[in-house]
UniProtKB/Swiss-Prot annotation:
It comes from Pseudomonas aeruginosa (strain ATCC 15692 / DSM 22644 / CIP 104116 / JCM 14847 / LMG 12228 / 1C / PRS 101 / PAO1). It comes from the Bacteria. This is UPF0301 protein AlgH. GO terms for cellular component: cytosol. Belongs to the UPF0301 (AlgH) family. Gene3D superfamilies: VC0467-like. Pfam families: DUF179.
Length: 189
């Protein structure tokens, strides 16, 4: 019998199935930053936290007044792990103190990217989140086999150009799926 190598889903969207019971992930779309034999890490991209960049910058530098445009830059709930830690997804090409290149995208985790965005010298498009979603080795694969998620290749246009309330249905539409027509019952043939 031929052994097949595992399929990893780095740079894919995880689309929560309608029956997802976990409140951290119900009705979410998650961008997978990393997925390998050791586990997976992703950022939920359609859950605004209610915070904006101005509020975050006020905490980082209480003595400086953030530019007014920062009040219109949303901060997202990236997931339930390390919710005090910031992650910025942006197109590749710009590098900061702590930037991980992900192909056509990059993820920066240092404060300098936030100050660059505030100053208007940072990436033109970005998604700023607090926290991340993490899976131990084999955990995501088990959830996939339980039909908890749909997957599709990530699309930066969905990530950066659509309002958050449209991202879930747009990601599902890439697969030709209308989530409102799916049943909560799952099975295997």
């Amino acid at each position: 019998m031929k052994q097949s190598s595992p399929t990893y889903l780095k740079h894919h969207f995880l689309i929560a199935m309608p029956h997802m019971a976990d409140p951290n992930f119900a009705q979410t779309v998650t961008y997978l930053v990393e997925h390998n034999e050791q586990g997976a890490m992703g950022l939920v991209i359609n859950r605004p936290s209610g915070l904006n960049l101005a509020e975050v910058l006020e905490q980082l530098k209480p003595d400086a007044l953030p530019p007014a445009r920062c009040q219109h830059i949303d901060i997202y709930n990236g997931g339930p792990v390390q919710t005090d830690r910031g992650f910025v997804l942006h197109p590749s090409g710009l590098s900061y103190q702590s930037t991980l290149e992900l192909g056509e995208l990059a993820m920066s985790t240092s404060q300098d990217v936030l100050f660059a965005i505030a100053a208007g010298t940072g990436p033109e498009k970005s998604l700023i989140s607090l926290g991340y979603a993490g899976w131990e080795a084999g955990q995501l694969e088990a959830e996939l086999s339980d039909n908890a998620w749909l997957t599709c290749p990530a699309d930066p246009a969905i990530l950066f150009d659509l309002p958050p309330e449209e991202r879930l249905s747009a990601a599902a539409a890439r697969l030709g799926v209308n989530l409102s027509l799916l049943t909560a019952q799952a099975g295997h043939a």
